Amino acid sequence: MLKTTQKSLLIFIVVFSLIFGTDQAIKYAILEGFRYESLIIDIVLVFNKGVAFSLLSFLEGGLKYLQILLILGLFIFLMCQKELFKNHAIEFGMVFGAGVSNVLDRFVHGGVVDYVYYHYGFDFAIFNFADVMIDVGVGVLLLRQFFFKQKQNKIKA
């Protein structure tokens, strides 16, 4: 029988691998020429040299090293916060799998491979599957941490 920490680590690794693999597979298709155009969403190829909305693009090649330090620092922190990691292994697997996939793009392609362009009614930033998974992972983590944790505390009281 796996200990809780080992089980959480296994869940983290599985989710990390699924998100990372899915994101890289989609990006491979985009890099091989897959395109789509519609009135609402286009699939186009863009190399994002910055982070969200191309922020910090002035850091150029140094950004990928800064991101590696941030990812490693956060992972070390989580390994020290076993309860937090145990309770949110799925969300952290999503965020780390997506984040590492985007950092890999910086090393391999010189920028993050972005491709989803939403333009119905207004122009929105071009993004990718990994960006969505980071948003979903953080969103679920916040919901569970603030809303569901409060319900648990009320039950105990």
From Swiss-Prot:
Subcellular location: Cell inner membrane
GO biological process, alphabetically ordered: proteolysis
GO cellular component assignments: plasma membrane
Pathway membership, UniProt: Protein modification; lipoprotein biosynthesis (signal peptide cleavage)
Keywords of this entry: Aspartyl protease, Cell inner membrane, Cell membrane, Hydrolase, Membrane, Protease, Transmembrane, Transmembrane helix
Membrane topology of the entry: Multi-pass membrane protein
EC number, UniProt record: 3.4.23.36
Pfam families for the chain: Peptidase_A8
Active site location: 114, 131
Keyword Glycoprotein among record annotations: no
Alphabetized PANTHER family for the sequence: LIPOPROTEIN SIGNAL PEPTIDASE (PTHR33695:SF1)
Family: Belongs to the peptidase A8 family.
Function in brief: This protein specifically catalyzes the removal of signal peptides from prolipoproteins.
Name of protein: Lipoprotein signal peptidase
Top-level taxonomy: Bacteria, Pseudomonadati, Campylobacterota, Epsilonproteobacteria, Campylobacterales
The gene coding this protein: lspA
